[in-house]
Amino acid sequence: MLKMNLQFFASKKGVGSTKNGRDSISKRLGTKRADGQLVTGGSILVRQRGTRIYPGVNVGKGGDDTLFAKVDGVVKFERVGRDRKQVSVYPKAQ
């Protein structure tokens, strides 16, 4: 007796799901005003996570560590010690 061994293969492969294709929106962090630039009170100077740059003279720190100007004036980025940076706002001389 003759035995036949028939095997049928899938004409379409199973479709797997991709592991790519998603990304979070950017948070737009970073320095918003440059050294020597004129700013008004309330202007955002730096958006950051944690205190990478510390508040100096006439600069406040928000709940999300955003640095903002308290008075109208000129922005000045400064080094404090070896490894600390701060931003200050000095009133413009009339």
From Swiss-Prot:
UniProt xrefs under InterPro entries: Ribosomal_bL27 (IPR001684), Ribosomal_bL27_CS (IPR018261)
GO molecular function, one term: structural constituent of ribosome
Propeptide: 1-9
Keyword set, alphabetical order: Ribonucleoprotein, Ribosomal protein
Cellular compartments per GO CC: cytosolic large ribosomal subunit
SUPFAM superfamilies linked: Ribosomal L27 protein-like (SSF110324)
ATP-binding among keywords: no
Superkingdom in the source lineage: Bacteria
Keyword Ribosomal protein (UniProt): yes
GO biological process: translation
Post-translational modification comment from the UniProt entry: The N-terminus is cleaved by ribosomal processing cysteine protease Prp.
Family the entry assigns: Belongs to the bacterial ribosomal protein bL27 family.
NCBIfam families in UniProt: L27
Protein name stated in the entry: Large ribosomal subunit protein bL27
Organism: Halalkalibacterium halodurans (strain ATCC BAA-125 / DSM 18197 / FERM 7344 / JCM 9153 / C-125)
Source species taxonomy: Bacteria, Bacillati, Bacillota, Bacilli, Bacillales
